[in-house]
């Protein structure tokens, strides 16, 4: 056995011989490194087979020309290699293939995909038991450690930090790997690396809702609502599964000075799981091994190093090209540098086409290969000729942020139509939607959800019937003494400009009987479900004459001393706030009453025996004949769609356009409270129970907690749904959508935060009014009523400050418009501002945090940031995607918003829509005669009253219905066939296409004797009708593609 000294001396001599043979003049440092490396020879000698493996060339070719250097490289790799293999399967954690943000920030699809990628990566890391280490994490990132400095404005939401990367970490890069100047700094730590990255398979185009192009091998990515980013791209998706990086430790850095380096080997995996963003990839690099090697001796290990992707075409200057693998083989994408257009064709076609001798041959072959798109033919021909033109680099304007649209599943339209605009980024991600009020299917859905499905036929038991008599007598102590106001006095009280104009139009015929007709439309306001119905009475005579009773009753009875303690309509905000504090301070524990669809669930019994009964008891017998006819119209009245003309059953519920709505809803609310008091304390006299009624304003109420159980029980007995909210001091108490953080001692209140934040960024002003003007006018009102409210006040100040600095119209010009106050808060226009005390600001913040679930520090930070922002489109949206979905009866980008699909409900909605469509078209045909009427249910919106006016009158006549048909029934007209209509029931210019051919004829005549349809006297044969029905497509049989 040789001793160690002999081995060292022999090794040194051998190295000198090798150096001279190779022509190396090895410096002392390198000689020492080689000598140190040769120390392993002692161990090798006793392992002959290993020594042979190092010296033989082996079955494959080697990159080292001499055996001894080859053996030394192999030896140091062998004895320093370290197995670092780790298993990680992020594909098991992919949460969604398609996702879009709830809030439209200009790029909801791209942003939503990034959110899903971030969640997928985080879930995969946590599931495998690793620590999440992220480079430049976003505000919503769940990273436990980070490398974070301030490069972009969005980085300022986190403090700068540089945590140490440790074993057990996974380094994460979300859409930022392109900017890393030294990728080895992270991969060289020998830990897993995961990235959500952009790696396009085309040289220009669209990714999600953003566009990109490539110039000089740099991708320019334009993001609406974001920035324009320019960067190179790493070749994560190139061939070669193993990548080699230099170790990032200090020892390896010093060792490189003497010719040694430590290498880290990672295996690269990637997938593209997001169809809406085909150019995005989820990349994960898992460590496999590490080893030391000599830097000056080549190695036989086959790995690759990361490099930047080269898009410039080597054979065509000014052009880009990239080859990718598709489901049917290789594809090549071709496009000019800096252009937004590119074409993608199979690589085998490209190889064949580029070998042709002339451009004419190329065009002929492409046509033979079934290429018919002129843009493809022209682009490939230009590429073949090598034609290069300068691409114009014009300034670009991003897509405007649009309101979120309430989109019922059965709406047959391709593009949304809403009458609203967004003037700033929303405060919360679950913002309000806007209804498509110009679509008749929207009205049909609202009628079903808010009228038809809410019918309440219940009659309460004997006890409640007795309480009703007591309550009416207590509200109106004296019977038959009331006298209505004169019409002149009433007209003076109805002083809104629209009311004044309408009264002037009917004043000369005011003595004529009013027309029995309700016209319904969907209110153009933010919503979370089917839009609210406004049931307006078409004849101003009815409103004027009925108001003479309702206004007198309010002034003389409801505002009388005995009703003042519970009846709140007509009070100013300061009076209401004082009343809330007085009431809460005087009871043991207050509670809130929250009715579900109050108007729709009011029964006929409640209308006749409680709500209308107080009017009829008060006014004298001379006035009762007219008054009874008016109150009867509140219960039963013909109705039609104002914009579209189809008839519907308005039901017996409260009609929102009636002059009694607020007052009688309050009376109904007070009655339910009275009944609950009588049931809880039957020993009380009626007058004592009446004095215990809480605060009531429409369907809002504040009531003692001790009556809550019977309050809910009474509501259920009369067919209404009541939810009682128990008072939580941390969340304050709510009345009239105002939150009182300390109702025992302070009148300070602020608008319900979540309800306000969801709609604060929207305006429904006329689109001809400049957006800046509409925005300032809207927020000025909030600054008066809620200037100190958490976030609301700061947001409104930010909007006003930014738009005024941007050159908005001056105040005098803005206030000269008649619609200047159209979007001012209601209370500002009728009674002034709600009281707010500066000393209660902190309390309001704490209360808002408790009510919304948003961290208090987050609210304070955002409120402060709003005071510094200079861009209304800055990213300020609070992410609430983890909260329960608040939307109903609508589609979003991922399907039904609530995640459920009930085919029965969908088919029923379609069926009702078809019935109403046939009703409209058949009545139009009956009125117009020989088939020249429009078959478009939306025709009323396009000035077609001339054609349809007579049909509308016949459908809903003024006179009473004949025996056997109640006046509130709306029988459908009979039709022999479905009439042809535009796609989705919409005419040209509204998302539909006009079908060729004449409109189908119907045999329905005009209605007579009320709303009963007249049977046809003659018509086509059964065979003709069936044939015509098969050949036509009305809204009932429309096959237009939905959303």
Curated annotation (Swiss-Prot):
The record lists the catalysed reaction(s) as: RNA(n) + a ribonucleoside 5'-triphosphate = RNA(n+1) + diphosphate
The alphabetical list of record keywords is:
Host membrane, Host mitochondrion, Host mitochondrion outer membrane, Membrane, Nucleotide-binding, Nucleotidyltransferase, RNA-directed RNA polymerase, Transferase, Transmembrane, Transmembrane helix, Viral RNA replication
Superkingdom classification of source: Viruses
| Miscellaneous comment in the UniProt entry for this protein | The viral bipartite genome is composed of RNA1 and RNA2.
Topology versus the membrane: Single-pass membrane protein
Provide one Gene Ontology cellular component: membrane
Protein's organism: Nodamura virus (strain Mag115) (NoV)
**SUPFAM superfamilies the UniProt entry points to:** DNA/RNA polymerases
| Official protein name in the record | RNA-directed RNA polymerase
Q: Spell out the residue ranges making up region: Cytoplasmic.
A: 43-1043
Q: Which GO terms describe its molecular function?
A: nucleotide binding; RNA binding; RNA-directed RNA polymerase activity
Listed EC numbers: 2.7.7.48
Family of the protein in this entry: Belongs to the nodaviridae RNA polymerase family.
Query: Where does the chain cross the membrane?
Result: 26-42
């Amino acid at each position: 056995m040789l001793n160690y000294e002999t081995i060292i001396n022999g090794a040194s001599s051998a190295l000198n011989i090798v150096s001279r043979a190779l022509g190396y003049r090895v410096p002392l440092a390198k000689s020492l490194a080689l000598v140190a490396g040769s120390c392993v020879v002692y161990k090798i000698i006793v392992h002959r087979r290993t020594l042979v493996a190092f010296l033989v060339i082996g079955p494959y070719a080697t990159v080292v020309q001499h055996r001894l250097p080859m053996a030394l490289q192999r030896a140091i790799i062998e004895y320093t290699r370290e197995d670092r293999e780790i298993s990680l399967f992020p594909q098991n954690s992919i949460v969604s293939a398609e996702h879009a943000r709830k809030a439209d920030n200009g790029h909801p699809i791209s942003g939503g995909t990034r959110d899903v990628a971030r969640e997928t990566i985080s879930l995969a890391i946590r599931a495998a038991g690793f620590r999440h280490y992220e480079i430049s994490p976003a505000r919503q990132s769940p990273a436990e450690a980070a490398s974070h400095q301030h490069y972009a404005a969005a980085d300022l939401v986190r403090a700068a930090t540089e945590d140490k990367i440790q074993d057990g970490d996974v380094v994460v890069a979300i859409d930022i790997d392109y900017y890393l100047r030294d990728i080895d700094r992270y991969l060289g730590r020998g830990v897993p690396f995961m990235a959500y990255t952009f790696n396009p398979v085309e040289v220009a185009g669209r990714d999600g809702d953003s566009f990109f192009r490539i110039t000089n091998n740099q991708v320019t990515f334009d993001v609406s609502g974001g920035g324009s980013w320019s960067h190179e791209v790493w070749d994560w998706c190139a061939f070669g599964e193993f990548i080699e990086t230099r170790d990032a430790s200090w020892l390896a850095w010093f060792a490189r000075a003497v010719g040694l380096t430590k290498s880290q080997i990672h295996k690269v995996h990637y997938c593209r799981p997001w169809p809406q963003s085909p150019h995005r990839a989820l990349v994960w690099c898992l460590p496999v091994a590490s080893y030391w090697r000599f830097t000056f001796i080549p190695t036989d290990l086959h790995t690759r190093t990361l490099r930047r992707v080269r898009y410039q075409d080597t054979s065509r200057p000014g052009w880009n090209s990239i080859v990718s693998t598709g489901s049917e083989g290789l594809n090549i994408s071709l496009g000019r540098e800096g252009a937004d257009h590119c074409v993608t064709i199979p690589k085998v076609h490209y190889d064949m086409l580029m070998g042709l001798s002339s451009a004419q041959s190329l065009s002929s072959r492409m046509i033979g290969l079934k290429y018919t798109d002129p843009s493809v033919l022209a682009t490939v021909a230009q590429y073949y000729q090598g034609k290069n033109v300068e691409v114009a680099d014009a300034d670009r304007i991003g897509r405007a942020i649009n309101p979120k649209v309430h989109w019922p599943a059965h709406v047959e339209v391709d593009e949304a139509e809403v009458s609203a605009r967004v003037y700033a980024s929303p405060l919360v991600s679950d913002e309000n939607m806007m209804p498509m009020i110009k679509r008749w299917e929207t009205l049909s859905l609202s009628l079903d959800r808010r009228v038809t499905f809410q019918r309440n036929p219940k009659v309460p038991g004997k006890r409640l019937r007795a309480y009703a008599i007591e309550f009416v007598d207590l509200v109106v102590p004296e019977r038959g003494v009331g006298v209505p106001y004169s019409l002149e006095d009433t007209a003076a009280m109805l002083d809104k400009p629209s009311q004044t104009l309408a009264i002037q139009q009917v004043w000369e015929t005011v003595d004529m009987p009013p027309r029995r007709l309700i016209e319904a439309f969907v209110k153009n306001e933010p919503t979370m479900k089917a839009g609210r119905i406004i049931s307006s009475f078409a004849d101003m005579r009815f409103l004027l004459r009925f108001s003479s009773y309702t206004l007198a009753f309010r002034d003389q009875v409801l505002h009388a001393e005995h009703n003042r303690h519970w009846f709140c309509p007509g009070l100013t905000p300061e009076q209401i706030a004082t009343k809330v504090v007085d009431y809460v301070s005087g009871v043991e524990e207050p509670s809130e009453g929250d009715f579900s669809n109050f108007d729709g669930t009011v029964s006929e019994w409640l209308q006749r025996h409680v709500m209308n009964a107080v009017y009829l008891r008060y006014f004298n017998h001379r006035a009762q004949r007219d008054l009874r006819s008016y109150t009867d119209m509140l219960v039963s009245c013909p109705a039609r769609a104002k914009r579209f003309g189809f008839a519907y059953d308005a039901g017996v519920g409260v009609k929102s356009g009636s002059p009694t709505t607020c007052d009688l809803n309050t009376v109904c609310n007070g009655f339910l409270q009275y009944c609950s008091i009588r049931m809880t304390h039957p020993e009380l006299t009626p007058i004592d129970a009446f004095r215990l009624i809480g605060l009531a304003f429409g369907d809002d109420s504040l009531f003692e907690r001790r009556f809550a159980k019977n309050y809910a029980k009474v509501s259920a007995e009369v067919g209404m749904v009541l939810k009682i909210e128990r008072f939580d001091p941390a969340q304050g108490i709510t009345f009239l959508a105002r939150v009182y953080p300390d109702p025992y001692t302070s009148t300070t209140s602020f608008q319900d935060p979540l309800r306000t934040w969801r709609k604060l960024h929207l305006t429904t002003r006329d689109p001809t009014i400049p957006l800046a003007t509409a925005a300032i006018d809207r927020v000025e009102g909030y600054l008066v009523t809620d200037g100190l409210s958490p976030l609301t006040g700061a947001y409104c100040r930010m909007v006003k400050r930014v738009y005024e600095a941007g050159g908005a119209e001056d105040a005098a010009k803005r206030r000269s418009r008649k619609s200047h106050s159209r979007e001012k808060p209601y209370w500002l226009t009728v009674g002034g501002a709600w009281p707010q005390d500066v000393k209660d600001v902190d309390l309001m913040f704490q209360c808002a945090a408790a009510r919304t679930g948003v961290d208090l520090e987050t609210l304070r930070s955002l409120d402060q940031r709003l005071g510094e922002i200079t861009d209304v489109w800055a990213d300020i949206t609070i992410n609430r995607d983890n909260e329960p979905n608040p939307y109903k009866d609508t589609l979003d980008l991922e399907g039904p918003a609530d995640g459920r699909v009930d085919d029965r409900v969908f088919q029923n909605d379609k069926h009702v829509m078809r019935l109403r469509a046939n009703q409209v078209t058949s009545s139009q045909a009956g009125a117009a005669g020989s088939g020249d009427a429009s078959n478009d249910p939306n025709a009323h919106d396009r000035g077609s009253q001339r054609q349809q006016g007579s049909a509308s009158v016949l459908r809903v006549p003024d006179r009473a219905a004949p025996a056997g048909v109640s006046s509130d029934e709306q029988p459908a007209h009979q039709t022999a066939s479905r009439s042809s209509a535009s796609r989705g029931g919409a005419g040209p210019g509204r998302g539909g296409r006009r079908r060729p051919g004449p409109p189908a004829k119907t045999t329905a005549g005009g209605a007579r004797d009320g709303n009963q349809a007249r049977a046809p006297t003659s018509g086509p044969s059964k065979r003709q009708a069936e044939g015509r029905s098969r050949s036509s497509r009305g809204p009932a049989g429309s096959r237009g593609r939905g959303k």
